[in-house]
Structure formats: C-alpha cells, structure tokens
C-alpha cells in the first residue's frame, strides 16, 4: 500500500516537519508514506480572477504531473464531503480491499485547486469549512491517515 500527499509549496516550519515526520514513522508499519511538494506559483497579493485562474492552472499542471493513472486521488476541497474518522477509515479499508494500493491526497495552494485537478480526483474530502494554512493541513491529514490505520487495525489510539 502506498499513500502519497501532494502539497503545493515548500514546508519551511520545523514544527510542522517534526509532526509530519512522527506520523510518517508511525505509518511505516502500515504503508509506504510519501509527501511530494510541488512549487507554488509566485503571484502578487492582489490578483484578478483571470490571474488567480492562471496561478491555479499552473499549480494544477505541476500536481497532475505527479499523479499516475492507477492512483486513487482525493482532492482536499472546502466543497468536498466531510467524513468522521471512522467513516474515513472504513473508506480507506474498502479501497484497499478492492485493489486500490496507491492512494494520493492533494492539497492545493493558497488559492485552492484547479478545475483540472478536481476533475482528476476520484473523490473530494473536506475537513470542514475552516480555512487552514496548507502547511498545517499536511500535518492534520497525516494524523488522520494514521488514525484511520489504527481504527482499521483495532488499536487503542482512536478513542
């Protein structure tokens, strides 16, 4: 089983790196876990809608270049479906049961994900209507993936 998170931008904060490294270590018992960073598109603070669309399209191309045809792709999107930890674990377990051994999660940059990435996604997932920094989302997602595996394996981590 291979789990990959594709994130836009470079993770600079040591505390996020440390947290993700801890969950990556824990996940090593259950899967090959990988985080792939794609460069964010440099843009001024104030953008027109056309400029925003162009930034998202360029970042989207970089994301799509990192996704293989066989991968089951979750796009993290505000309009995605919210799931409980138990529902998420059940879904991951079902995917692996039905032969999806490569699961990829995509976290967009500050403007979100391009329509092309959303179209490629097999499912959209939301962690609520909060706006969170995409760097923090990598840590939260890593923890939820670990939690899903502990639920699947009946371990006491999830209470």
Curated annotation (Swiss-Prot):
Its EC number is 2.1.1.177. GO terms for cellular component: cytoplasm. One of its GO terms (molecular function) is rRNA (pseudouridine-N3-)-methyltransferase activity. It catalyses: pseudouridine(1915) in 23S rRNA + S-adenosyl-L-methionine = N(3)-methylpseudouridine(1915) in 23S rRNA + S-adenosyl-L-homocysteine + H(+). The keyword S-adenosyl-L-methionine applies. It holds the Pfam family SPOUT_MTase. It is found in: Cytoplasm. It is an enzyme of class 2 (transferase). Keywords: Cytoplasm, Methyltransferase, rRNA processing, S-adenosyl-L-methionine, Transferase. S-adenosyl-L-methionine binds at residues 76, 108. Its main location: cytoplasm. The keyword Secreted does not apply. Belongs to the RNA methyltransferase RlmH family. Homodimer. Specifically methylates the pseudouridine at position 1915 (m3Psi1915) in 23S rRNA. This is Ribosomal RNA large subunit methyltransferase H. It comes from Limosilactobacillus reuteri (strain DSM 20016). The gene is rlmH.
């Amino acid at each position: 089983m291979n789990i990959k998170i594709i994130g836009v931008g470079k993770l600079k904060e040591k505390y996020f790196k440390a947290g993700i490294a801890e969950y990556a270590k824990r996940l090593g018992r259950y899967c090959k876990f990988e985080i792939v960073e794609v460069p964010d598109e440099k843009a001024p603070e104030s953008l027109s809608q056309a400029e925003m669309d162009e930034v998202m399209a360029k970042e989207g191309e970089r994301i799509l270049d990192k996704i293989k045809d066989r991968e089951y792709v979750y796009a993290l999107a505000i309009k995605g479906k919210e799931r409980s930890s138990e529902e998420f674990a059940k879904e991951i377990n079902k995917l692996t049961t039905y032969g999806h051994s490569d699961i990829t999660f995509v976290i967009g940059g500050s403007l979100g994900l391009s329509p092309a990435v959303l179209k490629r996604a097999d499912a959209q997932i939301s962690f609520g209507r909060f706006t969170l920094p995409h760097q923090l989302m990598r840590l939260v997602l890593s923890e939820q993936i670990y939690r899903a595996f502990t639920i699947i394996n009946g371990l006491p981590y999830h209470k």
